[in-house]
């Protein structure tokens, strides 16, 4: 019985280190949400940057740029940013 447990335990430890599994973080009520990025340009600037980056094939940069731009709209909370309440 112990002969099976020792290799089984070693296998579990090996597989755990290979998968780089991390424990789930518990909810921390005092953790600050990430700061909302700053976008000082106009909407047309945004689309010009998107078109330029697409011609260059820089799709990771397009995603970062879109995340920064759209964080300023009410859907920013779905991107992981805290968006303050805005009156219409």
UniProtKB/Swiss-Prot annotation:
Highest rank taxon of the organism: Eukaryota
Species of provenance: Cavia porcellus (Guinea pig)
PANTHER family listed in its UniProt record: OTOSPIRALIN
Entry keyword Secreted: yes
Pfam family, one: OTOS
Signal peptide as annotated in the record: 1-21
Record has Mitochondrion as a keyword: no
Function: May be essential for the survival of the neurosensory epithelium of the inner ear.
Protein's recorded name: Otospiralin
Ranges in coiled-coil conformation: none
Gene Ontology annotations for the cellular component aspect, listed alphabetically: extracellular region
Keywords on record: Secreted, Signal
Single GO BP term: sensory perception of sound
Tissues in which the protein is found: Ear specific.
InterPro entries the record matches: Otospiralin (IPR028224)
Family designation: Belongs to the otospiralin family.
UniProt subcellular location: Secreted
């Amino acid at each position: 019985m112990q002969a099976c447990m020792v290799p089984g335990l070693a296998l579990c430890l090996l597989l755990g280190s290979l998968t780089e599994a991390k424990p789930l973080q518990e909810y921390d009520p005092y953790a600050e949400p990430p700061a909302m990025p700053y976008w000082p340009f106009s909407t047309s600037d945004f689309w010009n940057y998107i078109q330029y980056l697409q011609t260059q094939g820089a799709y990771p940069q397009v995603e970062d740029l879109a995340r920064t731009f759209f964080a300023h709209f009410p859907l920013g909370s779905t991107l992981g940013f805290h968006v303050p309440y805005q009156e219409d």
